[in-house]
Amino acid sequence: MEEPSRPSSDTLTTVESSSGEPDKEVASPDGAAPATFSSVEEPSPNPTAMPPVWDHGGPLQQVAYPASDSCQTGSTNTGVGTNEDLRLPRRRPPPGKQIPCSSPGCCLSFPSVRDLAQHLRTHCPPTQSLEGKLFRCSALSCTESFPSMQELVAHGKLHYKPNRYFKCENCLLRFRTHRSLFKHLHVCIDHGQNPAPPPPPALDKEPPVPERPPESDPSSSLGLPFPLLEPFTSAPTGPFLPYLNPAPFGLSPPRLRPFLAATPGPPASSTAIWKKSQGATSSPRRPQGGSDAPSGACR
């Protein structure tokens, strides 16, 4: 029975408070509402949906970010500084070290390489022809002198000639340069186009050729009616004319003439034709009692 009495007392207190202090009652819900909303919203924010910078702890985090950036820049600066410190000895010597001059008899030293390079120019000045200086030839038995080195070099070529020349193929002349050879070729070609001079009279006369005696002919010594060698223009004569038939082989009549004409007979061409026809018609002879004989004859 105690439970129903409690709500009635609560309702009475709320009514009295509402009648006595209306301003406080209106203010209390406003103050409680943000508390409830804050209590509900605090565990709900999603860190992935919205960055934490825009939550209630914004100003603190904004101050923290620049601090982290400054730390990162500081770390990078220190890293660059360490790299530069490591590369300094490779490119230039450390400060305070003097670089001595490498020329013999010079005890000077310089703090930088640039100063040393400028100092070395005093030891090795550029080559220049001094006023009044003469260059003498070093060849034996030559006392000439020249005001410049270029003239001395040009003069030295007279004493030491290179073993090189350009030879003309027409007149077999030799030249030191190809330009002089080209100039000579114009003159040499003009002379080559002109008619050659007549040869000396001693070369015109030739020794007489001794004539052969008439007995040296082999055909006359053998007593043959026809010579061994005759020109192709001569036509065959005698009884050999009907035997010369150039149709089978297409040869000229002088080539088919027999070598010895003492005994008349058919020429070699007709004999060859007769043997060829005889061999085509007759069959080859078989040996008797051979393997090709019929089986009845061997019984």
UniProtKB/Swiss-Prot annotation:
<keyword id="KW-0539">Nucleus</keyword>
<keyword id="KW-0479">Metal-binding</keyword>
<feature type="region of interest" description="Disordered">
    <location>
        <begin position="254"/>
        <end position="299"/>
    </location>
</feature>
<dbReference type="InterPro" id="IPR031799">
    <property type="entry name" value="Znf-C2H2_ribbon"/>
</dbReference>
<dbReference type="GO" id="GO:0005634">
    <property type="term" value="C:nucleus"/>
</dbReference>
<comment type="similarity">
    <text>Belongs to the krueppel C2H2-type zinc-finger protein family.</text>
</comment>
<keyword id="KW-0863">Zinc-finger</keyword>
<dbReference type="GO" id="GO:0003677">
    <property type="term" value="F:DNA binding"/>
</dbReference>
<feature type="region of interest" description="Disordered">
    <location>
        <begin position="1"/>
        <end position="98"/>
    </location>
</feature>
<keyword id="KW-0805">Transcription regulation</keyword>
<keyword id="KW-0804">Transcription</keyword>
<feature type="compositionally biased region" description="Low complexity">
    <location>
        <begin position="217"/>
        <end position="228"/>
    </location>
</feature>
<comment type="function">
    <text>May be involved in transcriptional regulation.</text>
</comment>
<feature type="compositionally biased region" description="Polar residues">
    <location>
        <begin position="1"/>
        <end position="20"/>
    </location>
</feature>
<keyword id="KW-0238">DNA-binding</keyword>
<dbReference type="InterPro" id="IPR039882">
    <property type="entry name" value="ZN414"/>
</dbReference>
<dbReference type="GO" id="GO:0008270">
    <property type="term" value="F:zinc ion binding"/>
</dbReference>
<feature type="compositionally biased region" description="Polar residues">
    <location>
        <begin position="69"/>
        <end position="81"/>
    </location>
</feature>
<feature type="zinc finger region" description="C2H2-type 3; degenerate">
    <location>
        <begin position="166"/>
        <end position="190"/>
    </location>
</feature>
<feature type="zinc finger region" description="C2H2-type 2">
    <location>
        <begin position="135"/>
        <end position="159"/>
    </location>
</feature>
<keyword id="KW-0677">Repeat</keyword>
<feature type="region of interest" description="Disordered">
    <location>
        <begin position="193"/>
        <end position="228"/>
    </location>
</feature>
<keyword id="KW-0862">Zinc</keyword>
<feature type="zinc finger region" description="C2H2-type 1">
    <location>
        <begin position="99"/>
        <end position="123"/>
    </location>
</feature>
<protein>
    <recommendedName>
        <fullName>Zinc finger protein 414</fullName>
    </recommendedName>
</protein>
<dbReference type="Pfam" id="PF15909">
    <property type="entry name" value="zf-C2H2_8"/>
</dbReference>
<dbReference type="InterPro" id="IPR013087">
    <property type="entry name" value="Znf_C2H2_type"/>
</dbReference>
<feature type="compositionally biased region" description="Basic and acidic residues">
    <location>
        <begin position="203"/>
        <end position="215"/>
    </location>
</feature>
